[in-house]
Regions:
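N-terminal polyanion-binding entry modules of DNA glycosylases/AP lyases
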Residues: 1-119, 187-191, 195-214
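Catalytic DNA-binding helix-loop module of base-excision-repair DNA glycosylases/AP lyases
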Residues: 51-54, 106, 121-169
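Alpha-helix boundary/capping and short turn/kink residues
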Residues: 60, 75, 149-153, 168-171, ...
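A generic structural signal for well-ordered alpha-helical surface patches
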Residues: 68, 127, 157-160, 179, ...
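Short, charged, surface-exposed loops that flank catalytic or proteolytic processing sites
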Residues: 76-77, 119-122, 169-177
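Short, well-structured alpha-helical segments that form the helix of a local strand-helix-strand
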Residues: 82-85, 89-90, 129, 173-185
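Short basic/hydrophobic patches in alpha-helices and adjacent helix-turn junctions
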Residues: 112, 149, 161-168, 183-187, ...
Length: 214
């Protein structure tokens, strides 16, 4: 096994399956460790996509509060968000921070959401998502991996820190890091899903970049 695969096994042994991306069931956010069939409805797919926008520049707990506010207000659907005023959306997603910017991003996203097709290939989906104002590579790839269950590796600040801590990679742009992981692993959305979630868990648990599994 290469070092990237060995590290994955160590993370999995240490932290267990993470159950990402969490979805709303009943009136609470629920994780689903080991169940990679989720999302298994259009409603859950949309939840994940909106969650990926809300978690930009904040932690998941803040994004979670904003997502639940939209759900409680019965606005967590493309047609309802399209009709809602920016003022109403901004007030509900305030816990996620940058709420005015995120409101505009959500409005822009729902305008295009109906054009997204799960049957599209990854490159086509990614190109389309990146053409939507307010969606960068991390958000687009999170939607592709977690909402559409397609094998693309998500890169974030935790991933870069993880790479530095384990001497895997110390420089490069977003796609350099993404391709590094994708070439080192079997192309399976379940592995990419779990590995990224485990790296996020590692990032939250570790106190410094010197905390490693080597």
């Amino acid at each position: 096994l290469n070092i990237v695969c060995r590290l994955y096994q160590k993370l999995l042994k240490t932290y267990g399956k993470q159950g990402w991306w969490p979805v709303i069931r009943g009136s609470s956010i629920q994780y689903h460790p080991g169940d990679y069939s989720i999302p298994n409805s259009e409603e859950e797919r949309f939840q994940i996509a909106i969650g990926a926008i809300l978690t930009q520049n904040t932690n998941w707990k803040n994004a979670e509060k904003a997502l639940l506010n939209l759900y409680t207000a019965r606005l967590l659907a493309p047609e309802k968000l399209a009709k809602a005023s920016e003022y109403e959306i901004a007030a509900l997603i305030r816990p996620s921070g940058y709420y005015n910017q995120k409101t505009r991003k959500i409005k822009e996203f729902v305008m295009h959401y109906g054009c997204l097709d799960e049957k599209e290939k990854i490159d086509s989906l990614r190109e389309f998502l990146l053409s939507i104002r307010g969606l960068g590579p991390e958000t687009a790839d999170s939607i592709i991996l977690y909402a559409f269950k397609k094998p693309i590796f998500v890169i974030d600040a935790y991933t870069r820190r993880f790479c530095a801590a384990h001497n895997l990679k110390t420089s490069g742009d977003y796609d350099d890091y993404r391709e590094f992981f994708e070439k080192s692993l079997r192309k399976d959305h379940r592995i990419f899903n779990e590995y990224h979630a485990l790296i996020v868990r590692w990032g939250k648990e570790s106190k410094s970049t010197n905390h490693n599994f080597s």
